[in-house]
Amino acid sequence: MKRRSVCVGDTVYVLAGNDKGKQGKVLRCLKDKVVVEGINVRVKNIKRSQENPKGKRINIEAPLHISNVRLSIDNQPARLFVKVTEKGRELWNKHSDGSSSLYRLVRERKG
């Protein structure tokens, strides 16, 4: 499975769907989906019960596929790639105008 460049708390840019072009903060990461705050909001109807005698409608954020979001750096969608250094460190780097800059450490390789 491909490594995810998006983590909880990151700001992402939506590439496809009804909320295309919007930005939001990642609340949860699932296997190949992410839940973004205020994006892809669905209405859930709650049945009548003793706690809710009239029933209720609540808004929940539905998950988006990971391919439909891109990490937002400086309010622009950014493409990231993994670079392995001589010491075995895996780093997320981003391309910008021909140069690359470090964004986040992925992991340290042993050995």
UniProtKB/Swiss-Prot annotation:
GO cellular component: ribonucleoprotein complex; ribosome
GO MF: rRNA binding; structural constituent of ribosome
The protein's assembly and partners: Part of the 50S ribosomal subunit.
Domain of life, source organism: Bacteria
Function, as annotated: One of two assembly initiator proteins, it binds directly to the 5'-end of the 23S rRNA, where it nucleates assembly of the 50S subunit.
Protein name stated in the entry: Large ribosomal subunit protein uL24
Pfam families the record matches: KOW, ribosomal_L24
Family: Belongs to the universal ribosomal protein uL24 family.
